[in-house]
Regions:
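Bacterial N-terminal signal peptides that target proteins for export
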Residues: 1-9
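Active-site-proximal flexible loops/turns
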Residues: 9, 68, 293
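Structured, acidic catalytic/metal-binding patches in enzyme active sites
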Residues: 28-39, 43-255, 259
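A cross-kingdom marker for long, charged
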Residues: 253-313
């Protein structure tokens, strides 16, 4: 009888000792779920990775969200303030010396080499399309670097970044700073390395970027609102197929083999590390880096992570 009583008391003490730990786990899970729900109510497409130690929220960001796109940044801000850490993109690190290099070597980045002209590199059809845009906008792109021409078409002629609202990165960064939440970033690229990469690139390597930029500009400004609308309704494949998103993804640095691979490796590694951390991580990642074929989501899935959210391909 005494042994039965002692065994019963021992079992009860174990159960009582486990109760606080179980309560803590339950409270933590409820808190993480609340953060996820609040973040999802912002309207931005996102994915979650649940692990034994916490949750990672991956917010798929597009740059230059049109003001006509009905999303709610304040809800993402609210969720961020309750997170344990955030991961956001890092700006390149330019030194004063890099600025001087750009000034003295500017022509190497803005002009075709050896006094070359566009027809030296483009097919007759490509050159004819460029000529039509030159006539429409009263511009001379004949000597210009294809990358600079593409940027001019997208930013000034298509004017894709006019009348925009806050990017998700800006929202999360400001919220994290106000709430004193840890901010993690991928390693910053040095300005010197970026300038060297651009200077050494074959002009022909930027032709796909130019072609995509011409296609987006020819399609007209309706694609800007269409891209934002697809993003808001979580139609990720449609966003990725939008001519503007295609153009942005075809241009430097994303399309550069060396830089593009490093960018994707950095994001994949940081998110995998976050999945092994305790608590909730909010990561704002460029949508194209997440959702492209063999992108971050594909890589994480291949590593065995269970990913919940909208279809990305």
């Amino acid at each position: 009888m005494n042994r039965i009583l002692i065994s019963g008391l021992a079992a009860a003490s174990v159960a009582l000792g486990a109760a606080p730990a179980l309560a803590q786990q339950t409270a933590r899970a409820q808190s993480e779920n609340a953060i996820v729900v609040t973040a999802q109510r912002s309207g931005a497409p996102m994915w979650t990775i649940d692990t034994p130690t916490g949750t990672v929220i991956l917010v798929g960001e597009i740059r230059a969200v049109p003001k006509s796109t009905p999303w709610f940044p304040d809800r993402l801000e609210e969720a961020t303030k309750e997170a344990d850490r955030v991961i956001i993109r890092a700006a390149p690190k330019f030194s004063p010396g890099d600025v001087f290099r750009l000034i003295f070597r500017g022509g190497k980045f803005t002009k075709l080499p050896d006094k070359g002209v566009a027809a030296d590199y483009l097919t007759p059809d490509q050159r004819a399309r460029l000529a039509a845009l030159e006539a429409e906008y009263d511009k001379d792109y004949d000597r210009g670097s294809f990358l600079m021409t593409a940027f001019d078409l997208l930013a000034r002629r298509l004017d894709f970044d006019d009348e925009t609202t806050d990017d998700a990165t800006e929202v999360v960064k400001e919220a994290a700073e106000k709430a004193d939440i840890e901010i993690l970033r991928p390693e910053r690229f040095r300005g010197e390395d970026l300038l060297d990469n651009l200077a050494e690139a074959d002009p022909a390597s930027h032709i796909p970027c130019l072609e995509a930029a011409m296609g987006a500009t020819e399609a007209g400004q309706s694609i800007i609102e269409a891209r934002g609308a697809a993003w808001r309704r979580y139609d990720v494949p449609e966003v990725m197929a939008n001519p503007l998103e295609v153009a942005l993804g075809q241009c430097w640095p994303w399309a550069d083999n060396e830089l593009g691979t490093e960018i994707r490796d950095q994001w994949t590694g940081m998110i995998a590390d976050a999945a092994n951390s305790t608590g909730t991580t909010v990561a704002v990642v460029p949508l194209r880096v997440l959702a492209e074929e063999e992108g971050v989501l594909d890589r994480l899935e291949a590593q065995g992570f269970a990913i919940y959210g909208p279809l990305w391909r």
